[in-house]
Amino acid sequence: MIEINKIYNEDCLDTLKRIPDNSIDLVITSPPYNMNLRIRNGKYCSRQIVKEFSTKYEGFNDNLPIEEYYEFHLKVLKELLRTSYIIFYNIQIVTGSKRAIFKIIGELSDYLKDIIIWDKGYAQPAMAQKVFNRRSELILIFDAKNAISRQFEKANFNRGTLDDIWQIKRGKKVTNSHSAVFPEELVKTIIENFSNEGDLIYDPFMGTGTTAVVAKKLNRNFLGSELTQQYFEVIKSRLEDETYKLFNKKNI
C-alpha cells in the first residue's frame, strides 16, 4: 500500500500505478480545463491572451489538442475507477474541453452516477461577443461499483436535504499563479456527505491543496498528486499550518 497522508510531487498516473485496487474511499478533484485552446476560423489553436489569467503549470500550457485531452482524462478516470469507489470530478465546459468531456461521459456512461451543477454565484464577463458568461461548472460523479443506482452506498445526508445544484462561491486565491482554487466549502460538503472519519480521500490534481487541508480538518486520511513544484510547496506550507492549528486546538 502506498504511504498515505502524503502529497506526491509527480504525475498522478505515476502515483496511481502504486495504488492497489479499491483502496481509495473517495476522490475529489478538478483537473486542468484546457483553457488555452480556442477556435479560430473553424480550427482549434492556442490562445495566448488567456495565459495571463489562467492557472500556470510547469511544462504544460493547458492547450492540448482535443483528442489528446480526451485520452488523458480517459486514462486517468480508468485508473481512478480501478482504485476508488466514488469519484467527484469537477470540470468546466469551455472551448478546449467541451468535446472531450462529453465524449468521456459517453465512453464511461456505465460508471456515471450523477451530475452536480456548481453555481459559483458570479461569472467573469465573456472575452468574446455573443458568448454566455460561464457561471457554473460540472461535478461528474462516477461510481465504480453501482452507478446504475441513484443511491449512494456511503451517504450521510437525509432524504430531501441535498440538491443537485450547489450554490457555493468560488475559492479565494492562495497564490497568484493558480486562478482556479477549490473553495473549502465545496470540498467540505462532499467529504462530510460522502465519507466517514478515517476514510482515505485522494486528489490526483491537488493544486494548492484544499482537498488535503479539508480532509485533515475533518479527520480523514488524504493522498494527493501534484506535478507543479510551486504548488507542491504551497500545499506543504498549508498542511504544516493546519497541523499547527490542530495541535494548538487540542492543547487548549
Task: Indicate where each model-derived feature is located.
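Short, conserved SAM-binding/catalytic segment
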Residues: 1-3, 236-252
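Core catalytic lobe of class I
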Residues: 2-234
